[in-house]
Amino acid sequence: MRFSTTLATAATALFFTASQVSAIGELAFNLGVKNNDGTCKSTSDYETELQALKSYTSTVKVYAASDCNTLQNLGPAAEAEGFTIFVGVWPTDDSHYAAEKAALQTYLPKIKESTVAGFLVGSEALYRNDLTASQLSDKINDVRSVVADISDSDGKSYSGKQVGTVDSWNVLVAGYNSAVIEASDFVMANAFSYWQGQTMQNASYSFFDDIMQALQVIQSTKGSTDITFWVGETGWPTDGTNFESSYPSVDNAKQFWKEGICSMRAWGVNVIVFEAFDEDWKPNTSGTSDVEKHWGVFTSSDNLKYSLDCDFS
């Protein structure tokens, strides 16, 4: 997408409001759930990864509660390391969704409610046409009802936790999905300049443009600027096949970190980066799929690829 001067002006105004409220946006990371050999991560594996991330964040996001026993194994690790989790709930298919709710009911009582940052029902479910806006709204309301009946290890209720969703910025700005925004306590927007084939010269502009379009629609739909908002996924791969004018490399990932992620946070917008660690277990198939292994800011062996410092002066 080309950068729009009109939208840039609107974005600046919206960002100014955000920056007044929250100063520097928070940083978090999406976290994979499998080891290099494809086995599911244990509590010990998660503890090791969270220790590597601790210098940069205290919040992670996962896509599902039951897959690979994620909540069962990550919950205790996060609690031990002082992290909070955005817990994903996969809303399709029916058997998977039932397993997700069962995982919440079984493992949320074993940790403190302060370990949970919020619940995200679906991840780009609208973008993939997995669910209609009405169907996803119903699932969001259902999960809200489920967690309201669960108490933590100290007997505190999860009823006050926010329940929302995360989806691609472009489907959030589509008017026919407003029911999902209305049903959600909070909404996250994903935006990848890489998958739009942007040059490095335009990547950060495209990122800002996309996110601010989404934020503007979310604020308008909710009728308030006093809402929780995060970039749910963004980043740049460090290896693999180029996509149009977007080239994966460590230098380009570092540049996008500085010009896109750091700048977005400087305007007071919270950002969850995709992703924390490379996922070597992911298979190569065809086209540009080989980049899927290389989105981590850390290698799969926990080595930092480039500086994550931001200059907020």
Swiss-Prot record:
This protein strongly binds to glucan and chitin. Present with 45000 molecules/cell in log phase SD medium. Its EC number is 3.2.1.58. One of its GO terms (molecular function) is chitin binding. SUPFAM superfamilies: (Trans)glycosidases. It is found in: Secreted, Cell wall. Glycans are attached at residues 202, 284. Glucanases possibly play a role in cell expansion during growth, in cell-cell fusion during mating, and in spore release during sporulation. This enzyme may be involved in beta-glucan degradation and also function biosynthetically as a transglycosylase. The active site is at residues 124, 233. Pfam families: Glyco_hydro_17. It comes from the Eukaryota. It comes from Saccharomyces cerevisiae (strain ATCC 204508 / S288c) (Baker's yeast). The lineage of its organism: Eukaryota, Fungi, Dikarya, Ascomycota, Saccharomycotina. InterPro entries: Beta-glucan_modifiers, Glyco_hydro_17, Glycoside_hydrolase_SF. Keywords: Cell wall, Cell wall biogenesis/degradation, Chitin-binding, Glycoprotein, Glycosidase, Hydrolase, Secreted, Signal. This is Glucan 1,3-beta-glucosidase. Residues 1-23 form the signal peptide. It catalyses: Successive hydrolysis of beta-D-glucose units from the non-reducing ends of (1->3)-beta-D-glucans, releasing alpha-glucose. GO terms for cellular component: cell surface; extracellular region; fungal-type cell wall; fungal-type vacuole. Belongs to the glycosyl hydrolase 17 family. One of its GO terms (biological process) is carbohydrate metabolic process.
